Amino acid sequence: MIQARNKLSQEELSEAKKLINCCQAYDGTYRDPYLSNMLNFNPDMPAFFLYYEKGELVGLLTVYADDQDVEVAILVHPNHRRQGIARALYRSFEKETASYPIESVTF
């Protein structure tokens, strides 16, 4: 199940950080996605898409949008990859943000 948010609750933030740490340790990466919407051109636009499976956060899409050229980061738990989660998150992002003036998306 995917949930779209314009802000993360403290619990969601904690879950997101745990998922990010897990993915970074597995992938050997260090870049943290932006976990706030403070700089987004529209603070009401969904900036976080959370994919839950059996109550566990296993996928996360974040949106950094300080202008109409937005940056997206997608993380999926290593044990849940190759199951279409990233694709589902991106499609949800496209649907939920279709009415906002986004000109381009980079990863």
Please name every model-derived segment.
Residues 45-46, 71:
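Short coil/loop residues immediately preceding or within conserved phosphate-binding loops
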Residues 46-59:
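Conserved beta-hairpin
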Residues 82-96:
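Conserved acetyl-CoA-binding loop-helix of GNAT-fold acetyltransferases
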